[in-house]
Every structure is written in structure tokens, then in C-alpha cells.
């Protein structure tokens, strides 16, 4: 059975656990519509991605 040679210090234990924290997702404001969206994602309101129309937008009637 594997047994640790040395006691893990509180600092090292904390550094290992720092990756477990939940991080809030980042949002950017779209230049054209002003809507908040995730970076590198399509703007669902306009259907644009990187200045190109990639999605047909349904018009509300």
C-alpha cells in the first residue's frame, strides 16, 4: 500500500484545492447589439459571430 513519505503542508494542500473553486462565467458586451454574451460564442439575438452572419434569426410576429 502506498504511504506518503512526508506530511503535506497546509500551503501545498491549499494550492492543490485552489483549482476546485467555482468561478463565475465571463461575459462580454456585444459591440453591435449591446447584449451580454460569452466570449467566442454566437450572439443569439443577432446571429452574428466575428462580424459574420452565421445563424438565421427568427423575427417575432
UniProtKB/Swiss-Prot annotation:
Keywords: Ribonucleoprotein, Ribosomal protein. GO terms for molecular function: structural constituent of ribosome. It comes from the Bacteria. GO terms for biological process: translation. The keyword Transmembrane helix does not apply. Residues 1-44 are annotated as: Disordered. Residues 1-16 have a biased composition (Basic residues). Residues 28-44 have a biased composition (Basic and acidic residues). The keyword Ribonucleoprotein applies. GO terms for cellular component: large ribosomal subunit. SUPFAM superfamilies: Zn-binding ribosomal proteins. InterPro entries: Ribosomal_bL32 (IPR002677), Ribosomal_bL32_bact (IPR044957), Ribosomal_zn-bd (IPR011332). Belongs to the bacterial ribosomal protein bL32 family. This is Large ribosomal subunit protein bL32. It comes from Methylobacterium nodulans (strain LMG 21967 / CNCM I-2342 / ORS 2060).
Amino acid at each position: 500500500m502506498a504511504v506518503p513519505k512526508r506530511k503535506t503542508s497546509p500551503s501545498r494542500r491549499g494550492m492543490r484545492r485552489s483549482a476546485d473553486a467555482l468561478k463565475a462565467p465571463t461575459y462580454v458586451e456585444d459591440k453591435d447589439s449591446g447584449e451580454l454574451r460569452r466570449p467566442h460564442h454566437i450572439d443569439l439575438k443577432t446571429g452574428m459571430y466575428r462580424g459574420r452572419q452565421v445563424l438565421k434569426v427568427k423575427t417575432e410576429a
